[in-house]
């Protein structure tokens, strides 16, 4: 049996009714990754229609591959959304959007959103798969939090020849770029150490 990452808790379900809107404002045609943060207004209105299948069929590698595709700026398939009664329903692309939400919120089926959804009762197998997914993502891409740190503090990043997706390794909370590595010392300051580009 294949091991799947359970991302079903990340987008709540709701009854999908098409209601004519009298609003004159058009919904935004694009969204930013920060719109998927747990406390973001856009994220709070996301819903999966009841007829959507569970978002629990992707392997850890497939979740990692999709997040990597996004992080490296490659083309990803469109996600189809529908606004109705103040909610934004995901008509197509629930797995893709859930994978990004998982990365942004560090919740691969075992984080705070999932714990609340499952009333803090998460199967050990689900926790194990979530940890495996997190490890794969942190190794190859880096956590969203580390990417945000790199964006907010570019002066702490030493320019190098590595691909951006390889730059951050949250498993040891350091930033690696080019032939240098920044690592937090015991005193809390960043120290650079020689390091080759990760493969």
Region annotations inferred by a language model:
Residues 1-42:
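N-terminal leader/domain-start detector
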Residues 19-29, 52-199:
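Basic- and aromatic-enriched surface patches that contact anionic nucleotides/nucleic acids
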Residues 33-45, 159-166:
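Short, compositionally biased low-complexity segments
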